[in-house]
Amino acid sequence: MKYLNQQEAISVDEELFNEYKFSVDQLMELAGLSCAHAIADAYSPDRSNKVLICCGPGNNGGDGLVAARHLSLMSFVPYVYYPKRTDKELFKNLQHQAESMGITVSVDCPAGEWVEAEFGLIVDALFGFSFKPPVRESFRPIMEVLQKTKLPIVSVDIPSGWDVELGPQTDCDIMPDCLISLTAPKLCAKHLVNAKHYLGGRFVPGKLEEKYAMNLPAYKGRDLFVRLS
């Protein structure tokens, strides 16, 4: 299985939109749904049913908003931290859908002590494969919470703060308990240490997989994810 570099990941996304005519909301829904299913596979809601989902301003954050909605239908209780809103209709709709299902969507950075006491699991959907260090000032408080937490962290596609190709660059980078790679793993996933690794996003056309020599593993039956490790 191939691990994509940053430019390959960007190019694959562009081809899905331009060549294969997928829409952003279509891929986001499929990606977020697969994340929710992978999380439900990895963590029992009996132990981790209250989930803090940290969403950034881009498509990675959109995946997190979708995952929150689906997790709420799987016996989890999501709480979304979504500090940097956008005027794009898609993201407004995703927020509205989450709130309409009784999910709290907050702009206030949660205190570390409250997070430890209140939640059993954290989902990191802050930054995706377009991220380039350093982390912006406005996101440093939540990154500090993620760096210091003793709770398991599930990162969506890229552990936030990591270099997309080189992985963690400092001792302070977060170390997820689980990574859900989307479409195909990125090079940074080779730097995971003792972490669960899932692949989600069961929508890659065969010709596109062949063009980039992805050699993706087969999904079983109706599964929306593959566990890689």
Swiss-Prot record:
Q: What is its EC number?
A: 5.1.99.6
Q: Which cofactor does it need?
A: K(+)
Free-text remark on how the cofactor is bound: Binds 1 potassium ion per subunit.
The GO terms this record gives for MF are: metal ion binding; NAD(P)HX epimerase activity; nucleotide binding
- Keyword Metal-binding assigned to the entry: answer is yes
Q: What catalytic activity is recorded? A: (6R)-NADHX = (6S)-NADHX; (6R)-NADPHX = (6S)-NADPHX
The UniProt keyword set, sorted, is: Isomerase, Metal-binding, NAD, NADP, Nucleotide-binding, Potassium
Residues binding K(+): N60, D124, S160
Q: Which residues form the YjeF N-terminal domain?
A: 9-216
The UniProt entry's GO CC annotations, sorted and at most eight, read: mitochondrion
Entry's Gene3D superfamilies?
Answer: YjeF N-terminal domain (3.40.50.10260)
Residue sites binding (6S)-NADPHX per the record: N59, N60, G61, G62, D63, G128, F129, S130, F131, K132, P133, P134, D157
Where does the source fall among the domains of life?
A: Eukaryota
Q: Which family does it belong to?
A: Belongs to the NnrE/AIBP family.
Q: Which PANTHER family is this protein grouped with? A: NAD(P)H-HYDRATE EPIMERASE
Q: What does this protein do?
A: Catalyzes the epimerization of the S- and R-forms of NAD(P)HX, a damaged form of NAD(P)H that is a result of enzymatic or heat-dependent hydration. This is a prerequisite for the S-specific NAD(P)H-hydrate dehydratase to allow the repair of both epimers of NAD(P)HX.
Specify the protein name: NAD(P)H-hydrate epimerase
Origin organism is Anopheles gambiae
